[in-house]
């Protein structure tokens, strides 16, 4: 993985795009699709994930709509897509092993792949690189979010 | 999960601070339904009403030492778009006035709950 920022022990890879307020990341793939997942900060806030339900391939979602739901012992909520588009693949492994979201949020714990429909415009509202790390730093300080613990 | 968007769920909670272990799950289910894009309302009545008195829900901790209280969940529910409503008649039972309620709760009468039950796709009661 390329350069990784650290915010209170949470990893923020600088090559990804982030919707910091929704705790999601986006990776632009070579074929024009994007991979979407939840951040290290999000998995830490949720705690060990007990169930993850992901929407189905073929569904079109507007930015901000849920692409799935995540439940832990103390939290249940939506994963909101940071970009509009059609879901072209879902991570089937999450059904059997939802704690992939905790162990490898930027890798094996990806949630969906989408064909974005408004990327050029929507990417402007996402943060990447040092700017993303800075914005996350401000958020965890403002909301006093606890330091990351990594489940192995 | 695709057909659930916009479905209406009505959760009726009749348990309150005197039975803490019966207070969490109904709120948790409501938050889950909201996360699944459903239109969700919790109706607090009978003993359920007393958890809405300012300062009460903070005293009920999900698991000792967890730091997660019933108030945490009620706040999460409001953030998730769950509507909280309370039975006007039951407030009188607990000597509660509108200003005693936590923020974000709507006071409704008995006829409203009958309408809401008929309009809902599903009613869950606890």
Report each predicted region and the residues it spans.
Chain B
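Anion (oxyanion) recognition and catalysis
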Residues: 34-35, 78, 117-118
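A short aromatic-anchored loop/beta-hairpin motif
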Residues: 76-77, 85, 98-100, 106-114, ...
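Histidine-anchored nucleotide/phosphate-binding helix
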Residues: 23-38, 42
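Short internal beta-strands
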Residues: 39-45, 84-88
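Polar low-complexity intrinsically disordered regions
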Residues: 6-10, 121
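A glycine-rich helix N-cap at a beta->alpha junction
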Residues: 59-88
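Short, glycine-rich nucleotide/cofactor-binding loops
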Residues: 11-24
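N-terminal beta-loop-helix "entrance" segment that forms/cooperates
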Residues: 48-62
């Amino acid at each position: 993985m390329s350069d990784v920022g650290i915010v209170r022990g949470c990893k923020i890879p600088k090559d990804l795009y982030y919707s910091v307020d929704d705790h999601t990341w986006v990776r632009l793939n070579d074929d024009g699709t994007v991979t979407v997942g939840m951040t290290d900060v999000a998995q830490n806030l949720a705690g060990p994930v007990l169930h993850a339900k992901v929407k189905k391939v073929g569904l079109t979602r507007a930015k901000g709509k849920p692409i799935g739901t995540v439940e832990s012992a103390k939290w249940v909520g939506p994963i909101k897509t940071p970009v509009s588009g059609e879901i072209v693949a879902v991570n089937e492994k999450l059904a059997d092993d939802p704690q992939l979201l905790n162990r490898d949020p930027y890798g094996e714990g990806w949630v969906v792949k989408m064909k974005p429909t408004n990327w050029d415009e929507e990417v402007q509202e996402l943060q990447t690189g040092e700017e993303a790390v800075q914005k996350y730093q401000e958020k965890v300080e403002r909301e006093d979010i606890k330091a990351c613990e990594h489940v192995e | 999960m695709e057909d659930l968007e916009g479905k209406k769920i009505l959760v009726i909670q009749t348990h309150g601070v005197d039975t803490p272990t019966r207070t969490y799950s109904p709120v948790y289910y409501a938050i889950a339904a909201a996360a699944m894009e459903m239109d969700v309302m919790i109706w607090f009545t009978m003993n359920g009403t007393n958890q809405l008195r300012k300062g009460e829900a903070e005293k009920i901790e999900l698991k000792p030492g967890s730091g997660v209280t019933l108030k945490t969940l009620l706040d999460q529910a409001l953030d998730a778009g769950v509507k909280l409503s309370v039975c006007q008649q039951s407030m009188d039972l607990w000597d509660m006035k509108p200003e005693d309620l936590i923020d974000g709760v709507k006071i409704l009468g008995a006829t409203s709950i009958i309408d809401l039950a008929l309009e809902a796709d599903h009613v869950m009661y606890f």
